[in-house]
A protein has these predicted regions:
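Bacterial Sec-dependent N-terminal signal peptides
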Residues: 1-24
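Accessory beta-strand-rich segments of carbohydrate-active enzymes
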Residues: 28-30, 39-42, 81, 86-194
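Accessory carbohydrate-binding/adhesion or oligomerization-edge regions at the termini
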Residues: 19-73, 77, 96, 151-155, ...
Length: 195
């Protein structure tokens, strides 16, 4: 009898484990680091959707353009940026969002951009983030083309010589995430604080 009961319980457990789940993910965080375009220098047209970025360098994030430059004591920032160049640069990325996700909310999160970044999605201005050490995010939902191509453009302005007292680099130097949630969800406030 004990053997029959044990076998029945094992069989029931296996059937429950194999049953399809009706659970859906409430929050999906996508690694958004791959396939960005980059160009050093500045031009306001670079924020536009139809701007031709085909000649730009393709790279993956995180990226620091200062460390790629030449070590020269003559740069205006001098020792404050380790004798490496600063300046202005642009990043762009083209991506698609499925039509089926029309009822979802999309947020882009930057874990760190040095410094003074401005962000556009499909030519629409999302905002400016001064400095460069804090995580920040923008809601993309009402500006996305569901079922079509979307273009995000990021202008990074690290042209203020000596903005720091140590080497800080330039660019999107930390991870970027595309976060998809239901409209009704718990807001993520960016961490746990213990005092």
């Amino acid at each position: 009898m004990k053997l029959l009961l044990s076998l029945t319980l094992i069989l029931m457990g296996a059937l429950l484990k194999a049953a399809p789940s009706t659970e859906t993910k409430i929050r999906v965080t996508e690694d958004f680091n791959m396939g960005w375009k980059f160009l050093l220098g500045d031009s306001p047209e670079r924020r536009e959707v139809n701007y031709d970025d085909s000649q730009w360098r393709t790279l993956n994030l995180p990226h620091d353009w200062s460390i790629e430059g030449d070590y020269t004591p003559d740069f205006p920032a001098g020792k404050n940026n380790g004798f490496f160049p600063e300046g202005l640069g642009w990043y762009r990325k083209t991506f698609t969002v499925a039509k089926e996700d029309l009822n979802k909310q999309f947020v882009i999160q930057f874990d760190g951009v040095f410094m003074n970044s401005e962000v556009w999605i499909n030519g629409c201005y999302l905002g400016r983030r001064p400095y460069g050490y804090s995580t920040f995010r923008y809601d993309l939902t009402d500006k996305l083309k569901f079922g079509g191509e979307n273009v995000i453009a990021v202008r990074v302005d690290n042209s203020n010589p000596g903005a720091d007292r140590w080497y800080h680099g330039s660019g999107i130097y930390r991870n970027v995430h595309l976060i998809k949630t239901n409209y009704v969800h718990f807001r993520h406030n960016g961490g746990i604080y213990i005092t």
